[in-house]
Structure formats: structure tokens, C-alpha cells
């Protein structure tokens, strides 16, 4: 018997999970690396504050405006192929963004934003397709992974820029995750297939629960998702949360440098405290404690409000509210999309509902950095 055959099912399942989480890491690294480098980038390219704010708004604007198109692309290509498209566009955009000119910075950022827009739909669809029985856990891991990679990028982007320049640092924090994630994605989620690789499904035991939900095809039962009141309630809530998050996270490193005399690296780490622990608490609240959705969302909102209140009243005490709002930010994202996936009867309904919510939320959020700047 080969060594591969002797691996337990849990080990094979973990390989599939790692392949998915590697993809999730790419969804935030290309965007999260820019705020701590914004001062250097703006100085070298001669950008004013408005241009810098516009640059940080480009990906979020893409997430909003391009989501309807991305939804059609995912439906046309399928989940696995669309995920590979995300990785390719992120890599191409990052290389162009680091070319060292203003137009390249904006053009590359648009390409990155367009690619990640597709990925923002792919990730919850993979969870709904392959991990629907552990939705809260996998959505929490998805959100937490995004925030961990942002933490690493913001902590190390400036030190790396001191060695290889901001262009090299910005490119590295996309290229390395993309290449690693791409290798795993090709192995675990082969293009052209609507499920993980068959041999992995069989060895992991996943074949027992990956059923007709894997098919990304239209469903006609019930009203269209955009006619459902619950869809718009979730869209408005997501819009408010993303506006607040991107408004503060887009400029928090710069504000901490100016107001508290922190180093650029220290400011990046402080800003990246937003959202690591929270997502992991979502499966605890939903599954272990069995809290209803209303209680979960109420606790999350209370934690989030601590940050704007503290920044207005006592900005020198930023650490605790940053941690509380970080818990809230990550937890809200995970909780919201857990509800979306659970309430979707198929992967296709998941895609359409997510598209409505993200279009609304990110269009509102895109003006956050400019307004707060």
C-alpha cells in the first residue's frame, strides 16, 4: 500500500481545506499591503492626498461596480476556473502596479480589483458547495485567513520596502501568495470540474456530501433574490459595516503615524488588528453556544461601536477599541455570509445573493477612504 493510500481521511480533507484557505489569502493581500506603503508610494509618484485616497478606493469600487459582471463570469466559467482567473489577474495586476508610474499604479490596481471581485464570489460558493455542513466554521476560517495575511503584509511591508523598495514589497506580497495558492488550487480544484479533484474527494470522504449543490445552474423556485426583503436588509448592514471598516482601515496607519508618532511598521500592525479573532468566534456562537442570529449580530455591533467612539473621545487609547472592533469586523463578515450560505438552496442562489449584497456594500464602502481622508 502506498504512503498516499495510508493517509487518513482527515488528512486528505485538511489538504482540501488548505487549498481553499490559500486561495482566500490572495483575496486580501494585494489590497492590504498598500495602506502602510501609501506614504512612500505617494511621495515617489507625486500623488496628493486625494489621489492616494482614490487609489485605496479603486479595489473597493471594483468590488461594487464589477460584481454583477463577475457573477456572470463565474456562472459561465464555473467555480474552479473562475478561481484560477482570480489568481492570474491578481498576479498580472500586482506586477503592473509596481512598474513605478502613476498610471501603472492605477491600472494595476484596477486589474487586481477586477480579479479579486471574481474571487469574492468564488470563496462563499466553494463553502456552500463543498463545506455546507460546516458553514460557520469554514466562513470563519475564510475571513480569519484574509485578516491574518493582511496582518502579516502590513507588519512586514515597510521593513521589506526598506530593502527592495515599495514596488518590490507590493509585488512580493501578491506574487508569493498567488504562486503558492495557484499550485494548490490547480491540484485541489482542477479547472473545468465543478467539484474538488475526484481522487481527493474519494480519499477524504467528501464524496458522501458533495451532491447536486455542486452544480452552478439557475434555480427558478421562489422570488428573485433581489426582490427578497432579507437580501436588502443584509445588503444595507454589509454596506454600513464595509464603509466603516474601509474608511478607517484605509487611513488608520497614516493617522497613527501623524497623531501618535508610531513608526510606519507599528502603525501597519495596529491597523491590521482589525479582524483576526472575530471570525473564529462565529462558529462558537452559532454552533457551540447555539445563539440566534439576532444575538450574534447585536454583540458584534456593540463591539464595533467602541472604535469610532474612542477615536473621537480618547484617541491615545486606541489599542483596546482596535481589538474589539477587529473582533466585530471579522465576526460580522463571517456571520453575515454564514447566513447567506445557509439560507441559499443552491450554489447558484448563493452566487446571486452574494452578488447583490457585495454590489451594494462595496459601492457604499468605496467612498469611505476619500470621505475620511
Residue ranges of predicted features:
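Helix-to-loop junctions at the C-terminal end of transmembrane segments
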Residues: 66-78, 280-293
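Extracytoplasmic gate region of multi-pass secondary transporters
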Residues: 34-35, 229-272, 279
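Cytoplasmic helix-loop-helix junction between adjacent transmembrane helices
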Residues: 110-144
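A late C-terminal transmembrane helix in Major Facilitator Superfamily
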Residues: 347-373
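C-terminal transmembrane helical hairpin of 12-TM major facilitator-type secondary transporters
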Residues: 292-336
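Conserved MFS/SLC helix-loop-helix module at the cytosolic interface between two early adjacent transmembrane helices
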Residues: 65-103
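Helix-loop-helix hairpin linking two adjacent transmembrane segments in secondary transporters
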Residues: 102, 133-134, 141-192
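Juxtamembrane intracellular "pre-TM" segments in multi-pass secondary transporters
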Residues: 2-10, 189-234
Amino acid at each position: 500500500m502506498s504512503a498516499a493510500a495510508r493517509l487518513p481521511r482527515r488528512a486528505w480533507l485538511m489538504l482540501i481545506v488548505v487549498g481553499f484557505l490559500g486561495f482566500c489569502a490572495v483575496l486580501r493581500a494585494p489590497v492590504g499591503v498598500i495602506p502602510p506603503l501609501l506614504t512612500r508610494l505617494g511621495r515617489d509618484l507625486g500623488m496628493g492626498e486625494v489621489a492616494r485616497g482614490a487609489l485605496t478606493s479603486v479595489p473597493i469600487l471594483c468590488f461594487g461596480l464589477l460584481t454583477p459582471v463577475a457573477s456572470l463570469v463565474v456562472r459561465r466559467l464555473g467555480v474552479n476556473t473562475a478561481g484560477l482567473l482570480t489568481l492570474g489577474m491578481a498576479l498580472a495586476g500586482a506586477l503592473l502596479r509596481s512598474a513605478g508610474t502613476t498610471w501603472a499604479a492605477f491600472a494595476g490596481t484596477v486589474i487586481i480589483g477586477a480579479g479579486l471581485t471574481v474571487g469574492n464570489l468564488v470563496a462563499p460558493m466553494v463553502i456552500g458547495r463543498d463545506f455546507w455542513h460546516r458553514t460557520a466554521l469554514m466562513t470563519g476560517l475564510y475571513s480569519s485567513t484574509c485578516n491574518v495575511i493582511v496582518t502579516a503584509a502590513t507588519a512586514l511591508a515597510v521593513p521589506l520596502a526598506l530593502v527592495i523598495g515599495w514596488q518590490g514589497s507590493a509585488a512580493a506580497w501578491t506574487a508569493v501568495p498567488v504562486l503558492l495558492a495557484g499550485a494548490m488550487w490547480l491540484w485541489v480544484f482542477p479547472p473545468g470540474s465543478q467539484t474538488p479533484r475526484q481522487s481527493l474527494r474519494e480519499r477524504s470522504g467528501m464524496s458522501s456530501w458533495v451532491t447536486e449543490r455542486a452544480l452552478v445552474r439557475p434555480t427558478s423556485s421562489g422570488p428573485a433574490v433581489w426582490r427578497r426583503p432579507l437580501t436588502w436588509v443584509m445588503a444595507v448592514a454589509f454596506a454600513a459595516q464595509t464603509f466603516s471598516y474601509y474608511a478607517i482601515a484605509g487611513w488608520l496607519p497614516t493617522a497613527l503615524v501623524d497623531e501618535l508618532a508610531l513608526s510606519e511598521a507599528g502603525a501597519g500592525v495596529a491597523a491590521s488588528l482589525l479582524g483576526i479573532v472575530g471570525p473564529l468566534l462565529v462558529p462558537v456562537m452559532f454552533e457551540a453556544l447555539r445563539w440566534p442570529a439576532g444575538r450574534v449580530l447585536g454583540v458584534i455591533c456593540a463591539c464595533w461601536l467602541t472604535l469610532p467612539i474612542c477615536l473621537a473621545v480618547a484617541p491615545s487609547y486606541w489599542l483596546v477599541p482596535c481589538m474589539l472592533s477587529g473582533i466585530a469586523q471579522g465576526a460580522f463578515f463571517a456571520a453575515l455570509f454564514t447566513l447567506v450560505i445557509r439560507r441559499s438552496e443552491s450554489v447558484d442562489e448563493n452566487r446571486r445573493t452574494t452578488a447583490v449584497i457585495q454590489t451594494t456594500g462595496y459601492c457604499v464602502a468605496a467612498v469611505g477612504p476619500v470621505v475620511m481622508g
